[in-house]
Amino acid sequence: MATIKEIQQRLELVTDLADPFLAEAANDQRSGVQKAIEKRKRAIQAELDEDLRLEQMLRYEKELYKADYQAIAGIDEVGRGPLAGPVVAAAVILPPECKIKGLNDSKKIPKKKHQEIYQAVLDKALAVGVGLMNNEIIDQVNIYEATKLAMKEALSKLSLKPDYLLIDAMKLDVDIPQESIIKGDANSLSIAAASIVAKVTRDKLMADYDKKFPGYDFAKNAGYGTRSHLQGLERSGVTPIHRKTFEPIKSMYE
């Protein structure tokens, strides 16, 4: 009779719930074997669920490939709401049928997974572009217009010219066919890829600013108006990266 460890090792090779070995192993009544079977079944089901989720997130891209578009760029931004720092946009062109496990709206990805998924996007993407508009531009033109400028800059930095754009809840005045998708980062894999690139890029910038302007907790709050950030403003005042048209900073200048 095989040991429990040997059966566990064999189960690790099973990738299909219909694999005959699962039924065969189920005849072994040892609790260690039964637990190992259930664990492996859960893992296989999780893989199937993840593949289905990713397949759903490719539905926009697949329709466009059918319409003979070849280079589809997903575009998203991070940083519209913070009191400090830039708004960062990214544009990403993924190859057809590209599925990156765990890729989702960056707000739904655990922080400990950000770097890993960001790197997977960089490794698999056909092209990646990043655009940034600092707080001074945000104050000059407003955050909505600055976001569009950042997206257009990200688009201009792609090494491959896209023939279609999928954009998260935004329209751009560029001469490329496009679709604006509400909650696009949760519904399109290309937009989700842009979301994580923009998120990791901006978080790194804010961590660097935290060293330059200590006392505001930028590395943790990314410039959002958390208690520690507001306490820093009360204690030390406004830094050169704060948005002067955003409250409560605006009132400090009146």
From Swiss-Prot:
GO cellular component: cytoplasm; ribonuclease H2 complex
Residues involved in a divalent metal cation binding: 76-77, 168
Entry keyword annotation includes Glycosyltransferase: no
First-listed, main subcellular location of the protein, grouped into a coarse class: cytoplasm
GO biological process: DNA replication, removal of RNA primer; mismatch repair
Cofactor note: Manganese or magnesium. Binds 1 divalent metal ion per monomer in the absence of substrate. May bind a second metal ion after substrate binding.
GO terms for MF: manganese ion binding; RNA binding; RNA-DNA hybrid ribonuclease activity
Superkingdom per UniProt: Bacteria
Keywords of this entry: Cytoplasm, Endonuclease, Hydrolase, Manganese, Metal-binding, Nuclease
Protein localization: Cytoplasm
Cofactor names: Mn(2+); Mg(2+)
Catalytic activity: Endonucleolytic cleavage to 5'-phosphomonoester
Entry's EC annotation: 3.1.26.4
Start and end residues of each RNase H type-2 domain: 70-254
Function: Endonuclease that specifically degrades the RNA of RNA-DNA hybrids.
Protein family according to the UniProt entry: Belongs to the RNase HII family.
PANTHER family: RIBONUCLEASE H2 SUBUNIT A, RIBONUCLEASE HII
Protein name, UniProt field: Ribonuclease HII
Species of provenance: Streptococcus sanguinis (strain SK36)
